């Protein structure tokens, strides 16, 4: 029985298009081959040809690297639940499906050009369709992580800490615990949420530099999506629970300690320790500000960011939420996401401009009134 040549399974025009795409990508940067599957910008096309493209092809042509990143993230979450061994997998799968539907509804409307991507509505819908599902998925991790597995690896994480560092900050700093020190670090631990909100809102709603927005967006989404997926591989409760009998001094403080405790109990995923997002996200912001210090606002904010980041990182261990290895993992994640976002967006921005595809992000600008309006 004769075997069919695999190449005969592909339409000739499709092969020619992919050949042209490979040549263009290789000409831009060998790194682009890694992402050649994600952005099928086979060749520049004129406006008339673009308008005649079917809706599905417009969506596919206009997708950005971060759109693929989030799609992979939610599919991976869903598969982890499907093959998980914990309770309430059906409800967790439903929640992930809703998140994915929110993402792709926005992509279908904006990337499919049902509304103009550069318009206020298009820009706003795209931003919401990216960040709202990721935020929802974090809140849902409280149910998703137990649905994937009931195990906790605190013993293994602690053993690794002791082998690598011969030091566990949560235990070593126990003699330093007082209401005053607890409140100090609680303030900075809680400031993480404000820092996250300020940075995201500033870049997504106020910033005008398209490339800068895209770099920030891809990087911070990579940080959160990677962390959420690794939580399923390395679940743990942290020293506050696993080492509860090892502490002599109880954590107690004022307003900020109560705020931290209530927030963690109400919305925390509980087994989300490796890597530390309280380390990764502020570190990413700090690296981003340093890299783009040619912008005055980022140059001025860098020292403040660096100080807050250092205190937030110390707080994660002082307040007994994280082991030292969690911090190392968070620093590594932030550094890799930052460097990768710079490389991806340098390539993607050039490729989209070359092939006549709209930028990943458009500045969010309010609609202007007509000339005759006052």
What are the residue ranges of the model-derived segments?
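N-terminal transmembrane-helix/juxtamembrane module of multi-pass inner/ER membrane proteins
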Residues: 11, 22, 32, 38-45, ...
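Aromatic-anchored segments of alpha-helical transmembrane domains
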Residues: 74-82, 134-136, 224-231, 307-317
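Interfacial segments of alpha-helical transmembrane regions
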Residues: 122-130, 197-235, 305
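Transmembrane alpha-helix/helix-exit interface in multi-pass inner-membrane proteins
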Residues: 139-155, 223-250
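Membrane-interface loop-to-helix entry segments
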Residues: 181-196, 269-290, 324, 328
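Membrane-interfacial alpha-helical segments at the cytosolic side of multi-pass membrane proteins
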Residues: 198-205, 279-297, 332-343
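Membrane-interfacial catalytic/cofactor-binding modules of polytopic membrane enzymes
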Residues: 229-294, 299
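Interfacial helix-loop-helix junctions of multi-pass membrane proteins
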Residues: 238, 273, 311-336
């Amino acid at each position: 029985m004769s075997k069919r040549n695999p190449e005969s399974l592909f339409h000739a025009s499709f092969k020619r298009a992919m050949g042209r795409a490979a040549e263009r990508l290789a000409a831009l940067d060998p790194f682009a081959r890694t992402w050649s599957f994600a952005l099928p910008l086979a060749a520049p096309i004129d406006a008339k040809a673009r308008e005649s493209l079917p809706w599905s092809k417009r969506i596919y042509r206009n997708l950005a690297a971060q759109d693929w990143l989030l799609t992979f993230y939610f599919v991976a979450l869903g598969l982890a639940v499907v093959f998980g061994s914990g309770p309430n997998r059906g409800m967790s799968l439903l929640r992930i499906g809703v998140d994915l539907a929110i993402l792709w509804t926005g992509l279908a409307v904006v990337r499919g050009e049902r509304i103009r991507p550069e318009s206020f509505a298009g820009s706003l819908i795209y931003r919401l369709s990216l960040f709202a599902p990721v935020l929802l998925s974090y809140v849902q991790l409280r149910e998703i992580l137990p649905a994937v597995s009931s195990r906790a690896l605190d013993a293994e994480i602690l053993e690794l800490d002791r082998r690598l560092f011969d030091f566990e900050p949560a235990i070593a700093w126990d003699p330093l615990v007082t209401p005053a020190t607890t409140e100090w670090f609680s303030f900075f631990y809680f400031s993480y949420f404000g820092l996250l909100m300020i940075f995201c809102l500033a870049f997504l709603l106020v910033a005008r530099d398209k490339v800068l927005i895209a770099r920030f967006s891809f990087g911070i989404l990579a940080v959160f999506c990677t962390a959420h997926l690794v939580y399923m591989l390395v679940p743990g409760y942290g020293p506050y629970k696993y080492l509860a009998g090892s502490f002599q001094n109880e954590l107690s403080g004022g307003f900020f300690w109560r705020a931290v405790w209530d927030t963690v109990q109400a919305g925390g995923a509980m087994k989300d320790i490796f890597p530390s997002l309280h380390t990764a996200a502020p570190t990413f912001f700090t690296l981003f500000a340093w890299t783009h210090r040619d912008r005055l606002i980022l140059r001025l904010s860098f020292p403040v960011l660096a100080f807050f980041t250092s205190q937030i990182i110390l707080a994660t261990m002082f307040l007994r939420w994280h082991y030292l290895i969690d911090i190392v993992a968070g620093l590594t994640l932030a550094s890799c996401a930052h460097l990768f976002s710079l490389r991806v967006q340098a390539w993607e921005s050039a490729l989209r401009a070359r092939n006549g595809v709209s930028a990943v992000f458009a500045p969010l600008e309010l609609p202007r009134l007509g000339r005759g309006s006052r």
